[in-house]
């Protein structure tokens, strides 16, 4: 997914700046666009006719053995289940949407994640959770896992701490894929409520068309605010940054997230964030976020109404900007990479 791509590429960039001693091999069944920069980082293409998950389970272990890998890292919820002598396994666990909100996922994805993801968790030597929230979810669903196996290592962001505040335009922004879990129908209904109250909300949606997006598009087609909503599709990094910076506010009504990177991207752009009160968003933003119940269009409409009644809410106060700095300094890819490297090295070390 696009979120995993951002996670993996940024973490690889940061690891390459940090570590010139250990040797890394990146295995892929097909060519990738990402370019490695260091001599100690190697891309190994292993052409395969198998679907990704079957390549991972049945072909990848042979390469891991041939290349004499000490520590194998699975960055996306699953890992090969075969036990290889001398190989330690590290797994990143992003979220448990497949258990909490199964109906918001394709059945095939849900089945694969449930079958292989659960077994991957049980067969890993170290588990990296992207937030405290995900670590709590892991302990809830897998209560038998030893606490010392679980490491909370937050995602990062390439921050622009000194960024100037840009002039705000009269639109709300949502970024992410158009799929049921992102809860865009509730956002649509909230904006309809605001229109009934005499406000003129405009919304821009940036992101790829996800699974089951037709139902949202049908709701939009029949909506009283359809002419005020723009679906922009997948955008370049530069265009997305410009949208983040010029939006009146960023709205993120997602039902469930393991981390919630878009809220951090909006904060980085000095844009006010309205977000679901669930999952880890409060963990990231603290008092800087404006929260609502994602299950209720009335709660969301009431939150957004504050913005239309008080336009200065689009801008952070000096005190809030100080807090923003602290948050962005905490969530850096450099910190993420340092802590990941520490997990890799402790797994590679022989137990005394």
Q: Would you name each region that the model predicts?
A:
Residues 1-352:
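Carbohydrate transferase catalytic cores enriched for Leloir-type hexosyltransferases
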